[in-house]
Amino acid sequence: MAEKRFGVIGYALAPKKQNSFIRDSLVSLAKSRGIELVRVDSDKPLADQGPFDCVLHKLYGDDWKRQLQEFHTLYPNAVILDAPEAIERLHNRISMLQVVSELRIEDRPETFGIPKQIVIYDKATLLDPQAWESLKFPVIAKPLVADGSAKSHKMALVFTRDALNKLKPPIVLQEFVNHGGVIFKVYVVGEHVRCVKRKSLPDVSDEEKALGGVSEDLMSFSQVSNLATVNDCDGYYRLMHLDDDTEMPPDAFVVDIAGGLRRALKLNLFNFDVIRDARYGNRYLIIDINYFPGYAKMPGYEAVLTQFFCEVMLKKKQQEEQQQEEGNAPKEKEESLQA
């Protein structure tokens, strides 16, 4: 008996992303639910391929945006995950976190926000003490652009004002907040939300702050998500997983934040990093938001993504049926009048 075909999803991903995300385990599980995952050939126009019920992508550039628009014109009912315009908001570390201020979560004891931060566009501003005098050191220096490139992941913990001249603008200076050396990574897949805890930068004591760091006034570090390669992803998870009794944020609180971000950003596939401010027991700070993160690092990602794909296909089918009914209604009325 032939397998029931629910939908075809074309995926357009960079080679590294494809290798880490499109695993045999995901392809097999999706196929068992009637979802076929098909690679988009980057050497051919998207509009000449398929047809696809959905395009799952993480490619950038004007040419790719044009291809998506042409595909949408040909197949207006096809689902694009996600809209390039919505994704681009996350490419700027200032605009990505501005959305947090738009959230309204009521009737909860927990509070949330973002660390104090400023953007420095040029060297002259960087060397002007008045530009950053409101910040308390240490600060984390991050490139303003967050486009997934290796350059965008180059960050540093800056302990002293004198170390600022080692940085290259445009950058964002974000106050470092002690958080117990634990970061909570919240994965969002449509309405599915999964929160895991990972090791983070250790707290900085008052003595270390006074001395300007342990041994250096500026300490470079790699973003945690870049530590793993495809081959050592499982080892990465074991390394970064915390077996201690660190308390997780309340599930309902995390789900509320995730839902608010999903609606405000108009995105389905992203994760956000949260820390618990060590100065307050129930104060949480969102420090980063990433589009289409490394879902393979999330335990059981295959089941979550497959269920999401099925939900996307079901919603698409329901919308098409509704459109068909609305399109037939005037015709049926006209025929009844003629009779």
UniProtKB/Swiss-Prot annotation:
Annotated ATP-grasp domain ranges read 104-318
Tell me its EC number(s), please: 2.7.1.134, 2.7.1.159, 2.7.4.21
Q: Where does ATP bind?
A: 93, 142, 153, 174, 177, 200, 287-288, 290
Q: List the biased-composition ranges (Basic and acidic residues).
A: 328-339
Please tell me where 1D-myo-inositol 6-phosphate binds in this chain: 16, 58, 148, 153, 185, 187, 271, 290, 294, 297
One of the protein's GO biological processes: inositol trisphosphate metabolic process
Q: Does the keyword Glycoprotein apply?
A: no
Cofactor(s) annotated in UniProt: Mg(2+)
UniProt binding sites for Mg(2+) 2: 288, 290
- The segment annotated Disordered runs over 319-339
Gene Ontology molecular functions: ATP binding; inositol-1,3,4-trisphosphate 5-kinase activity; inositol-1,3,4-trisphosphate 6-kinase activity; inositol-3,4,5,6-tetrakisphosphate 1-kinase activity; inositol-3,4,6-trisphosphate 1-kinase activity; magnesium ion binding
Pfam families named in the record: Ins134_P3_kin, Ins134_P3_kin_N
This protein's source sits in the domain of life called: Eukaryota
UniProt keyword Cytoplasm, yes or no? no
Q: How is this protein named in the record?
A: Inositol-tetrakisphosphate 1-kinase 1
Please tell me the species this chain comes from.
Glycine max
Q: Which gene encodes it?
A: ITPK1
